[in-house]
Curated annotation (Swiss-Prot):
The keyword Lipid biosynthesis does not apply. GO terms for molecular function: ubiquitin protein ligase activity; zinc ion binding. It comes from the Eukaryota. GO terms for biological process: innate immune response. Plays an inhibitory role in anti-RNA viral innate immunity by targeting the adapter DDX3X and promoting its 'Lys-48'-linked polyubiquitination. Alternatively, enhances the cGAS-STING pathway activation by promoting 'Lys-63'-linked ubiquitination of STING1, facilitating the STING1-TBK1 complex formation and STING1 activation. It is found in: Cytoplasm. Transmembrane segments: none annotated. PANTHER family: E3 UBIQUITIN-PROTEIN LIGASE TRIM (PTHR24103). The gene is RNF39. This is RING finger protein 39. CDD domains: RING-HC_RNF39, SPRY_PRY_TRIM7_like. It catalyses: S-ubiquitinyl-[E2 ubiquitin-conjugating enzyme]-L-cysteine + [acceptor protein]-L-lysine = [E2 ubiquitin-conjugating enzyme]-L-cysteine + N(6)-ubiquitinyl-[acceptor protein]-L-lysine. The lineage of its organism: Eukaryota, Metazoa, Chordata, Craniata, Vertebrata.
């Protein structure tokens, strides 16, 4: 298959392999210390890093369609994010002949056969088989080929090969601009020339259809499959937090707002709230829209230079401490990033880790939970560039809930609906 075959593959995905997906795709295309409120109690072992690049996949959509104007660029960060969808949980490699279980988990056919062993003879009682991820009973007869995933993996490989071509390394690909940070030339004069190009201001890309990546609808639809539809759990919220009526937004309540009664699940010191949905297996992601103090002052006309926007977003285990001082680090069952003073920090121990240097925090942060692999990663919600990843050596071992913290009445945190 060649790169020119991708449009036909996308059309086949919509009309044959994924009944009903075509219409969906068409719709898509139309306590405060000096160091900050969340860092004073960070204690415990630092997270281990994993250098292995994760994978990428894409789901079909018609090319050359009218796209959203906030489309991310098709670059290495996007490839790294999407590749997870093409990775078999058992072997850690790309899917080969994927099969789908009754519980909706997919595996390589050969990997699953090795895990389950040889089926017994017909005259003997069959041993029970279960999903390696969630443990639900899955009879052998329930196996079926995952044709859609097989095509997505093939498209993913084509995308990676295209990004590796010399033309892609130069920085452009059929109307889409590709960042070169992930594929710089070897050390020497070529690298110095590359950095000099970065120092020259470049105009922002046009918002016309031709200036958006051709494969953005494919990528967006594929990511949409993992995005969880979340709401907040008011029963866990600190008494000074104000939850919106649709339970998708949280901010610090203004002075004088009546406080609800305390409860065993509420945080009593950390201004935090958990999501109503918890996850004990699989891969899940959600996006949070933040608002920094500067933008809030601009909209309100106020000038309060002595105040900063403080927030943290991420994930917390069901065992996270609700009363008293909370250890905001992986040892305390918290994996989060903090926006403070116009900067973004990973809440690592013993000290937080500054992310992005002098760059301001992204306005939209994507949290990616891979329960079986013990990984919680954070991405720029627009460009899908990786910001930071916490990596454990074992599965997380308990239900994980989305975590939202804020102590600024002007800077609410908002869950981005899954259909956005």
């Amino acid at each position: 298959m060649s790169w020119r075959d991708l449009p036909r593959l996308r059309l086949w995905l919509k009309t044959e392999a994924i009944p009903g997906e075509g219409r969906k795709a068409a719709k898509v295309n139309a306590g405060v210390g000096e160091k900050g409120i969340y860092t004073a109690s960070s204690r415990g072992g630092p997270p281990s890093a994993r250098s292995k690049a994760v994978a990428v996949v894409a789901q079909g959509a018609a090319s050359r369609s009218r796209l959203s104007m906030d489309a991310p660029e098709l670059g290495p960060g996007l490839v790294e994010r999407l590749e997870q969808l093409a990775t078999c949980p058992l072997c850690g490699g790309s899917f080969e002949d994927p099969v789908l279980l009754a519980c909706e988990h997919s595996f390589c056919r050969a990997c699953l056969a090795r895990r389950w062993g040889t089926p017994p003879a017909t005259d003997t009682e069959a041993s029970p088989t279960a999903c390696p991820c969630c443990g639900l009973p899955c009879p052998r007869r329930s196996l079926r080929s995952n044709v859609r995933l097989a095509v997505e993996v093939r498209i993913s490989r084509e995308l990676r090969e295209k990004l590796a071509e010399p033309g892609a390394r130069a920085g452009r690909r059929r109307g889409g601009r590709i960042p070169t940070m992930g594929c710089l030339d070897p050390p020497g004069e070529d690298m110095r020339k590359t950095w000099r190009r970065f120092e020259v201001p470049t105009p922002k890309s046009s918002k016309s259809e031709d200036d958006l990546p051709e494969d953005y609808p494919v990528v967006k639809n594929m990511l949409h499959r993992l995005t969880a539809d979340l709401t907040l759990d008011p029963g866990t919220a600190h008494r000074r937090l104000l939850i919106s009526a649709d339970r998708r937004s949280v901010q610090l309540a203004p002075p004088g707002t009546p406080a609800p009664p305390d409860g065993p699940k509420r945080f009593d010191q950390l201004p935090a709230v958990l999501g109503a949905q918890g996850f004990g297996a699989g891969r899940h992601c959600w996006e949070v829209e933040t608002a920094d103090a500067a933008s809030c002052r601009d909209s309100s006309g106020e000038d309060e230079d002595d105040e900063e926007s403080h927030y943290a977003v991420g994930a917390a285990g069901e065992s996270v401490q609700r009363k008293g001082c909370v250890r905001l680090c992986p040892a305390g069952a918290v994996w989060a990033v903090e926006g403070r003073g116009g900067r973004l920090w990973a809440l690592t121990a013993p000290e937080p880790t500054l992310l992005g240097g002098a760059e301001p925090p992204p306005r939209r942060i994507r949290v990616d939970l891979d329960w079986e692999r013990g990984r919680v990663a954070f991405y720029d919600g627009r460009s899908l560039d990786l910001l930071y990843a916490f990596q454990a050596s074992v599965p997380l071992g308990e239900r994980i809930f989305p975590l939202f913290c804020t102590c600024d009445p002007r800077a609410p945190l908002r869950i981005v609906p899954a259909e956005s």
